[in-house]
Amino acid sequence: MQLSPSEISGLIKQRIEKFDNSVELKSEGTIVSVADGIVTIYGLNDVAAGEMIKLPGDVYGLALNLNTDSVGAVVLGDYEHIKEGDKAYCTGRILEVPVGEALLGRVVDALGNPIDGKGEVATDLTSPIEKIAPGVIWRKSVDQALQTGIKSIDSMVPIGRGQRELIIGDRQIGKTAIAVDTIINQKGTGVKCIYVAIGQKASTIANIVRQLEEHGAMEHTIIVAATASDSAALQYIAPYAGCSMGEYFRDRGQDALIVYDDLTKQAWAYRQISLLLRRPPGREAYPGDVFYLHSRLLERAARVNEEYVEKFTNGEVKGKTGSLTALPIIETQAGDISAFVPTNVISITDGQIFLETDLFNSGLRPAINPGNSVSRVGGAAQTKIIKKLGGGIRLALAQYRELEAFSQFASDLDEATRAQLNRGQRVTELLKQKQFSTLSVALMALSLYAADNGYLDNLEVSEVIPFESALHALAETKYSDVIAEINETGKYDADIADKLKIIVEDCKANQAW
C-alpha cells in the first residue's frame, strides 16, 4: 500500500501535535541500607531537612540527617517491605497533619489518621507539624484563669490561659489524673482540649477515652495516640502533631489546652532515633539538641493578641485573643528532679506542679508538694475571689510544715503554735480531693473561706471532708443564687464575704454532716 505525499504530511502533523516535550523533574535516590526504622539513601542531592521522602509501598520517611553523599531518614510506618536497592523520591513537602473542628471527639494517631473506628475525619484543612512560635510582638500577657477544679492547684499554683505549667513526679502518682480532671473541668467553658499520649499502653489510652466519654468531655477533646507499640518516629512527632491541632484554635481567637503525657518518653524516642542515626551522644546519651526538642514545642503555647488573630484570619475575627495552654508531664526516677530532661523542661516552663510519692502514700491526693510547686505567671490570671481566699491557705500550710518537724521533739507547745498545727492539719485534710470531683469557683471559694476564717478549727480532722460535702450540698440547694453570682463574676467584696459567712454559719448550726 502506497501513501500519497499529502497523507504522509498529515500523519507527520498528527505525530507532531501529539508530541509532548514537557520535562518532568524528579529527584530520585537509591536506598543503600534499612534497619531499625532508619533508611540511608544515596543520590537525593536536593532534599531539605525535615522533608517528606516517598518510599516504596506508599510509605513516607522524614529526612533528619543530611550528609555530603547520603541522607538519613526515619520511616513513618512499616518498613518490612523496604529493601536495599529500592528507589526513594523527594516530595518537596514537609509533614502536615489534619486540623479543625472535625477532629473533636476523635482518637487519631501521630499522623492524624483515625484509629477509633468511627470512619474518616471530615476535614480538608492541614497544618505543618513544625511551626515557628509567635514572636514577642504578637503575644499578650497571661491574665485569664484556666480553672482546673482542683483546690490545691487553683488556690496555690494557679494556671492562666496561655501558660506552660509542668506536672512532674514519679510513676503511678496521679500526674495523668490531674490532667484528665483539668480536661473534664473545661466542659462548658469553650476551651478545646488535646490530649497527646506518648509511649503509653493502648489499654491505658482506651481507659482515658472511656473516662472522658463518661464525663461528657470527649465532645471538646482530641486524643493523639502514639502507643508503646508504635515506632520511635511516631512517638517523636506526636507532640508536634497535637500542637498543630491546638494552634488551629489559638490562631482563630479561641482558647485551647494541650496535655503532653509524657515528654520523658518523647525524649527517649528522640534519643533512640539520634543514636541510630549515629549522632554524637551527650549527657545521659541524649543528643546535643534535646533542649531544643522541648523548647521549640513548648514555646508554641502562648496567648496571642487581637492583631495576631485578625492578621491570621484576614480580618474575619476581630477583637479576640487566642491562647494555647500547655500541661507537659515529666516522669522522674525516684524523685530526682535534677536529672537532665526534668531540669530542661523546668527551665522552659512557667512553673511546675511537683507530686511526691510520700504524700501520695500517706493518703494526700492529689499529692502536691506546695513547697516545690510554683506558678510564675498564673497569679496575675487567678480569679479574684480565689486569690484573696487562697493566700491564707499557702501560708497556713507553710507554717504547718515548718512546725510539724519541730513539734515532734518539743513536749509542751504554746497556744499559738498549737493553733497553727491545728489549722495546718485541717487545711491539709481539706485539700484532699477525689478524682472526677472537680469544683466550681464558688464551691472552691466556700471551702477556702471556711478554712481561712477558722470554721474548721474546732472540727475533728476526720470531720473536715464530711463538713465540706454538707456545706456544698447546702449552698447548691438553698443558696444557689449566691453560687451563680460568684461563678459569673468571680469578684470578692464585703457583700460576697457576708453571704459566704451566712452559708458557712448556717451549715455549722445545722451540723448536718
From Swiss-Prot:
HAMAP family: ATP_synth_alpha_bact. This is ATP synthase subunit alpha. GO terms for molecular function: ADP binding; ATP binding; proton-transporting ATP synthase activity, rotational mechanism. The record marks 373 as: Required for activity. It comes from the Bacteria. The gene is atpA. ATP binds at residues 169-176. Belongs to the ATPase alpha/beta chains family. The lineage of its organism: Bacteria, Pseudomonadati, Pseudomonadota, Gammaproteobacteria, Thiotrichales.
